């Protein structure tokens, strides 16, 4: 954790193939001697630090495992927590975790609809060079357009995978 930035910086080397951080939250608990509480309060600062380091160098980041694979509600809550913090997914240890994890980390219909509205609004000729516009009465900046495109891309990728099965 102390060297998260330096490790993430390796991704800038074209000879390197670092694309993603995968967190070992059990290892983090062991080494820090923190208590494994449901809200992960004790390790949130370290999770946030690794997320910031990963993002600074364009890396994805996958949250650590949830040990009680029979506790779907607890697992779902931890997935929600990870997604809220900015994680891209979660390490899984049991087939029963696949469905809930996919549900949490897949953009909702509402998120996709909002993203499409933002994309459509900025694609209008009158808005093509604006930095800030209004969509449904809300201020939206170009940074929201970047976020909307990412959400739309994830939703599209999930649909393509679903079409395979």
Regions found by a protein language model. Give the residues of each.
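Expand to "…catalyze enediolate/carbanion chemistry for C-C bond making/breaking, isomerization
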Residues: 1-165
């Amino acid at each position: 954790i102390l060297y998260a930035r330096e490790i993430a910086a390796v991704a800038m080397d074209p000879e390197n193939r670092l694309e993603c951080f995968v967190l070992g939250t059990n290892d983090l608990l062991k080494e820090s001697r923190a208590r494994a509480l449901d809200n992960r309060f004790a390790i949130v600062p370290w999770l946030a630090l690794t997320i910031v380091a990963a993002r600074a160098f364009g890396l994805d980041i996958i949250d650590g495992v949830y040990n009680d694979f029979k506790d779907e509600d607890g697992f779902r809550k931890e997935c929600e927590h990870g997604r809220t913090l900015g994680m891209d997914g979660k390490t899984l240890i049991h087939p029963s975790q696949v469905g809930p994890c996919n549900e949490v980390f897949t953009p909702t219909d509402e998120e996709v609809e909002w993203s499409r509205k933002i994309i459509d609004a900025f694609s209008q000729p009158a808005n093509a060079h604006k930095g800030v516009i209004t969509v449904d009465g809300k201020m939206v900046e170009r940074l929201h357009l970047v976020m909307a495109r990412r959400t739309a891309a994830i939703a599209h990728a999930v649909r393509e995978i679903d079409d395979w099965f």
